Amino acid sequence: MTYFKNARPVWLTGREKEKNCGVGFICCFNSRELSGNNLVLSIASSGIYRACLNGSFLGHGPARAAHGYFRVDRIAIPSDLLQENNILTIEVISFYVNSFYIVEQPGFLQAELQCDDKVIRFTDADGDFRAHTLKERLQKVQRYSFQRPFIEAFRLEEGFDDWKKGTCGSGEPLCRQEDKQLLERRVPWPDFPVLQINKIIAEGTFDSGKADLPVWQDRSLFEIGDTLHGFPLDELEEKVSLVMDGCVTCTLTSGQSPSSLDDGGLLSEHCFFIADAGRNTTGFIGICLECTQASRVYITFDEVLLNGDVSYNRMSCVNAVSLELKPGKYCLETIQPYTCRYLKPMVLSGSVNIRDIYIRELKNPAVSQASFSACDDSLNRIFEAGRETFAQNAPDLYMDCPSRERAGWLCDSFFTARVEMDLTGNHLVEDNFLENYLLPEQFPYLPEGMIPMCYPSDHPDGVYIANWALWFILELYEYQGRSPQSSLIPALKNRVDGILAFMARYENEDGLLENIPGWVFVEWSKANELTDGVNYPSNMLYSATLLAASRLYKKEEYRQKGLRIRCKIREQSFDGQWFCDHALRADGRLVRQSDATEVCQYYAFFFGTAEQEDYPDLFNRLLEDFGPDRTARGLHPQIWPANAFIGNYLRMELLSRAGRPAQ
C-alpha cells in the first residue's frame, strides 16, 4: 500500500540522534487550492506528535509499531476548521532513549496533506514544511520514569508560540532520512474530549530548598548510563525531582465548600491550590495563566491524595511539569499524556493568576459500542469504571497502566484482549499488539527464542519474563477464537516454536522446568519469592501453553509433553491438601518444599492441572474459605494470600466457572 505520494521522512540536519529533540513543523495553504471535500493529513513519526490547524487541535499520535516499522495516521480535517488562509503545525518530540513507551529510533517526520488525490503540501528536504527547534522546551531534563522518557519543562516568554502563526522565517535546514517501512494505523482514531477542571478543594503554603529532607534515589535520575539512557545529572538544565524533594507543605486547608477557578486562581510565592478533576483520567494537561513578574511554577499531579495532599512521586515517576515564566500571558498544553485526578500548581517564586486548567483526554472511542444496565447502580458504576479503564489503557496497545509506563505488557494483554472483544466487538488493538511481536527479525539483548515482556520497548539490560512469553501463546490461542481467519496465527508459528524451544532447554529429567532464567513472575505476592528450583505454578502455565500450542498448530508432540508435565506436577506438588509452590535439590534429589500460596491453587485449577472432580475438597475450600475476608476469619494462615494481579483475576474466573458470579 502507498501511504504517501510525495512526502519523504525528514529531520533537522544532523540532529536525528539527539536526545529529547523537539521540532516544530509548519506549512501554509489557501483554501482556494482545495479541489474537493476530503482533506486528509497523513503522518508517520518515530517520536510523538501533536497536529493543529489554525491553532485548533487535530490529533496526537502515532500508534506504536515494532522496531523499524511506523504506523501512518490519516487525520480527516473538518471543514469548519478551515479559513481562507490556513496554518498547519506539527510538533514532534524525538526522545531517542530506550524506554517501554517509545522505542529508541532516530527522529523523523513524514507528513502529507492531500485533498482527494491532489497533494497540497508534503515534507522533504526542499518540501513545503519549514521547521525549527522548540526552544521553549528544556531539552536536557531528567526522565519521567525508568519506563518512560523525559519529563516536560518549559522556559517561556511571550511570543514563544508565534511560530505557529507563520512568523518563524525560513526555518532550519532539513535533511531527508532513509525511507521507512510503513504500516496502517488500523486501530480507531482516539477521542480527545476536553475535561475542564474548575473545582479547587484545598489550598495552602509550602517551603522550598529544604536540604535536610530525604532525596528520592530515583534510578532514572541517578543511574543514567549504558543500559538506561538519558542526560547525566550534572548536565540537567532543571532538576525537578530534587526541587520537589526540597519542598514541604506548611499549611493545608481543605475547604468545606470547594471554590472555583471562576473565582480566580491567584497564587503568590510559596502558595498552592489543589484542583479536582472529579475522576481519574488520562490526557494532556492544559493551563492558561498570567504573571506580572518572573515566576517559577511546578504543576504536580496524581491519581489520589495522601493525607489530603498531592505526592509527585508516589508512583515512582516524576508527576510534575516545570514552568519558568517571564511576565506575560500564556496558554500551554503538554504533548505527553499523563494520568491524574488531582492537580497542584505550586509557585516557587513570583506570582501567577491561573485562568484555566483542563485535561484533553486520550481515549479509545470504540468502548461506546457496549451498553450495560442493572437495577443495582453499584454494578453500573463498576461497569463504567471498567469501560473507562479500558478506554485509557488501550488507545493503540494493551497497556498495564496509562501513567508511569504506558507499556504494552504481556499477561496483562491476555485479560485485556478478552475485554476488547466484549466492549468494542472487534480485536483491532489486539491485531496491532500481536503484529508488533511478529515483525522484528530478532529482539536485541534477549536470548534466542525469547520475546520481550512488553513491546514495543527497549531492553538493553537484557531483562525478560519467560512466563510472559508463555502467556503470549495462550493469548494467541484465544485470539484464534476471536479471529479464526487471521493471517497472524500461521505467521507467528515460528515465534511460538522459538519460545517453546527456549523453554525446553530448562526441562529436567522429569520434563519439568527447573531454574528458569530471567525474571520468573507468578504474581505480585509471596509467590514471586518461591520461584527457585522447580516452580510448580510456572510449570502449570507451561503445560497449558504446550496444550494450547498443540491445538493451534496440530503438533502432537506438544500435546504429549503438556499432558506428561501435568501428571508430574500432580505427583510432586500436591501434599494431600495443597499444591505447594516449589521443590529444591537436596543431595541432587528434588525435595518438595512446604510453602504453599493461594495463587498456586488458582493456577492449578485455571490451567487444568487440577479439576474440580479430582480435587473436590481443595476446590470447595477455595470457594468457601478464601476471598477478601479470609485473614479476618483466621482461616488457613499458613497459605500465603494472593494479590490482585493475577491471583484474584484467576479466582474470579474460577468463581465464574463454578456458577458463582455474585460471589
What residue spans do the PLM features occupy?
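Extracellular/oxidizing-compartment recognition motifs
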Residues: M1-S403, D412, L428-D431, P444-P447, ...
